[in-house]
Amino acid sequence: LVDVGTENSAGDRCAYTMVSKDDYGEVKRMVGRMDGLLRYEHYVPQNLTNYYEYLDYYALSAQMPETYQAAYDFIQPVIDTVNRMDTDSEKVKYLNDYLCSLLTYDKKSVAGIIRTFAPHSEELKGACGDYAHDFKFLCGAAGIPCFTISTTNHAWNMVYADGQWLHVDVAANDLYRQNYILLAKTVSDRTDEAPEATAFLKELLAPGSTK
């Protein structure tokens, strides 16, 4: 741990953990998968340069940013409906269909949680990453363990539903207008590029689920 502050700049004091250049990509990918579990901190000490290289900087709080409160309020009626359902599978299917009703797939567009879960009259387009992050947001609000698997060219989710980890690809389900990958035990046409990170997150979100 390194303290970059001084006696005259107490407000700029911080500590960070450095990783090797070879490990940096893997560690950053892990932190990215934990988005929603660990909040990205936006304050940057004035005397800390290249802060994005120091991974602890991204894992300072387990609280959801206050900027998402409006999104939470927007989806509350949906969450109330989901909470009355009997099984996790029912809940996941409902949330999948709900998100498909809000977004239209376009790999060149960016929607984001705040835009997706807000009143809008125009067609809202998003890429696979938008679907994956939005779906994780919905699952989190519904109390369903969920994380995002991101590869070099695609992103989808895994959810812990009714005692097992299953794949959900809302973007593909919306694009093909069918339940293409919805609560699937395996996926044959997708490769998890960080299986160790996946195993770690499964145990983090649902202890004992991989044993």
Language-model-derived ranges and their functions:
Residues 12, 100-102, 106-109, 121-124, ...:
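Repeated polar recognition positions within modular binding domains
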Residues 1-74, 172:
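Linear, non-domain "peripheral" regions
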Residues 58-68, 95, 165, 172-211:
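Intrinsically disordered, low-complexity repeat and linker tracts
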Residues 116-131:
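A short, highly charged nucleic-acid-interacting micro-segment common to nuclease
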Residues 95, 99, 128, 139:
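Conserved hydrophobic/aromatic pocket- or pore-lining residues that grip, position, or stack substrates
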Residues 65-120:
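Secondary-structure boundary elements
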Residues 4-7, 37, 81-85, 207:
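Surface-exposed polar/charged interaction patches
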Residues 130-192:
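Hydrophobic/aromatic-rich core segments of domains that either
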